[in-house]
A protein has these predicted regions:
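Polytopic transmembrane helical bundles with strong interfacial aromatic enrichment
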Residues: 1-169
């Protein structure tokens, strides 16, 4: 089964000056494509590690000497910065071949995983804005935080796996 619903978006995006400019820039240089992919992988690693550390702490598996809320508050800016770099570097990859990406099931699944993971990260941050111990104050919040931590690990892992499969699907 192939998801073709998004193919018209890829066709439209490919006809835009932005996409044409991205293709021209990538063709004009020998270093831009590998530099973009390298930055994409480094940002992905940064994002995943920061999300994994927070998730593993919320699960109580690491960092028992660090308050979960304080740790998350320190790492979330790194997570958001890495996500911004991922959007820019991934955007260049997509703009170069939008038709291919928007016809790819793996790309659509990846974007779904990313959107859900970002939504959870926002929810985590909203809770932390109410206090560093927000997720530890009640048993229900602890269960939500732990479930969300597993959810985040699954979502970010799914995004990474689908991202790698885009090249081969």
């Amino acid at each position: 089964m192939t998801i073709t619903t998004f193919a018209p978006i890829g066709a439209w995006l490919g006809s835009t000056p932005l996409s044409q400019g991205a293709r021209a820039a990538l063709r004009a240089t020998s270093w831009l494509a590998p530099a973009d992919e390298t930055l994409h992988i480094l940002a992905l690693t940064t994002l995943f590690v920061s999300a994994a550390v927070v998730s593993l702490r919320l699960l109580g598996l690491v960092g028992h000497d660090h308050h979960a809320g304080r740790l998350a508050r320190r790492l979330l800016p790194l997570t958001w910065s890495a996500l911004a770099v991922l959007v820019l570097t991934g955007g260049l990859l997509v703009l170069n071949r939008p038709g291919r990406y928007f016809r790819s099931d793996m790309f659509i699944f990846k974007m779904g995983f990313v959107l859900l993971a970002v939504a959870w990260t926002l929810a985590l941050q909203v809770g932390l804005s109410r206090g560093e111990s927000y997720w530890e104050q009640t048993r229900g919040r602890q269960i939500t935080a732990r479930s969300g931590a597993v959810f985040a690990l699954v979502l970010w892992s799914g995004a990474i796996i689908c991202g790698r499969w885009i090249a081969y699907a």
